């Protein structure tokens, strides 16, 4: 690891980092990210103990510049003790239909009727109470992302698998049952805050703060650049923006991520749409 890091500055960031770190890339910084997390992590004792479960058999990684991917894979394999394979381009991370549509579609299903002052008497478990309505919504989002990938036919996006393929279920009921049965998902709660009479959505949860602004929004912006409509994804994003307008709490606006073009999406090259 020492030899790999001696000649370069290395940073490990999330799959949208190529957009926000253009200046760093110009200075020779290597940016890399994982397509999916190695495992599910749960906090047991704050600041002391985290329990990890459901480890994947292998990981996939992309880097900028692309030629650094192999070295980055070696670094991750060494650090985590598991195989890691390079992806063809960083877009294989940015457009992967994981949490950016999995979490956001579920949150829309659970809180689509939310309004200021509304209190929920009960919040279902996030995964164990997964229902077919959520799956149908998720399938629409998944199909839209796949259509976007097919439109970008000049790029090798073979690393982006649909959620149906990823979970091995193509029918709504079977997919819902699969999500409910995953052992590492057991007991995971819907992000909520206890209040008088029940619960409120916890907008500070990473399910909200990360997966909308730095996940779903980026997919929509790539679609915007490619002139490919993603109506279901946009509906969910518009819902989130419509009631969550405080810039201090809403990264979508706080980071300049609006419905229109944003400063680091001014060119096609800025999202890696050029080999």
Q: Can you annotate each of these PLM segments?
A:
Residues 34-36, 87, 160:
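Conserved beta-strand termini and adjacent loop/short-helix elements that scaffold enzyme active sites
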Residues 26-32, 83-87, 155, 229-231:
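Short secondary-structure capping/junction motifs at helix and strand boundaries
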Residues 22-23, 67, 78-83, 147-155, ...:
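Secondary-structure boundary elements
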Residues 16, 20-21, 76-77, 222:
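Broad structural signal for hydrophobic residues in well-ordered alpha-helices, predominantly aliphatic
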Residues 116-121, 128, 135-275:
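NAD(P)-dependent Rossmann-like dehydrogenase/reductase catalytic/cofactor-binding core
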Residues 38-141, 261, 266-274:
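Substrate/ligand-engaging "lid" and interaction regions
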Residues 1-49:
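Rossmann-like NAD(P)(H) cofactor-binding subdomain of soluble oxidoreductases
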